[in-house]
Regions:
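An aromatic-glycine-centered, glycine-rich loop/turn in mixed alpha/beta architecture
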Residues: 108-177
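Carbohydrate-recognition loop of C-type lectin domains
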Residues: 8-127
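Single conserved position on a long alpha-helix in the C-terminal lobe of the eukaryotic protein kinase
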Residues: 1-3
Length: 177
């Protein structure tokens, strides 16, 4: 992905991908979102940094500010800020054959959902959580599960670009049929 964005570094003025490349090269930066369509008025660019811990530290933000300051146009107002973390509770009911042992099943399902919500495993969809993703992850990781019903969140969750969904309380109910 960085290779594809490298063409932007040849441009005479910094583009969205130029800012992404510069910030992504800084240790500790996991994901960069650039709002370059004048989010605060003409000549403004907002850069949202997601660190490996979710929220970027002030030290990491300062490193990104310095890097962006070196490449920005004189008439561009660049604002570097951290992504906002939103804890999302997840409650699922899994159905398994009553002939199978249910020992440790709830813990395996909980570990599967926790793994789904790890930042490193999610690509660039850090602000989305869909029922389909939850169901697919559980059924892929725990082969004995016949059915998965997601009760929380009640619907797919899509937040603003500057927000990142992380795991809140994970509740698993196991039913035998």
């Amino acid at each position: 992905e960085r290779t594809l964005r490298s063409w932007s570094e040849l441009a005479l003025v910094p583009l969205r991908d130029t800012y992404i490349n510069v910030c992504s090269a800084i240790a500790g930066v996991l994901y960069v979102t650039v709002k370059d369509q004048h989010p605060r008025g003409q000549g403004t660019v907002d850069i949202i940094i997601t660190s490996e811990a979710g929220t970027a530290t002030e030290d990491l933000l300062e490193k990104c500010r310095v890097a962006c300051e070196e490449i920005r146009e004189p008439d561009t107002d660049v604002k570097v800020k951290s992504a906002e973390i939103v804890a999302q509770d997840v409650a699922v009911t899994v159905t398994v054959s009553s002939a199978l042992s249910q020992d440790g099943l709830a813990e395996r399902v909980q570990a599967s959902v926790t793994d789904l919500l790890k930042l490193r495993n999610r690509g660039d969809s850090l602000n989305e959580l869909t029922h389909a993703d939850i169901i697919h992850k559980i059924k892929s990781d725990v082969s004995t599960v016949r059915n998965v019903t997601v009760t929380t969140p009640a619907a797919d969750v899509t937040l603003a670009e500057e927000k990142v969904i992380m795991a809140g309380k994970i509740t698993v109910t196991v039913k035998g049929v």
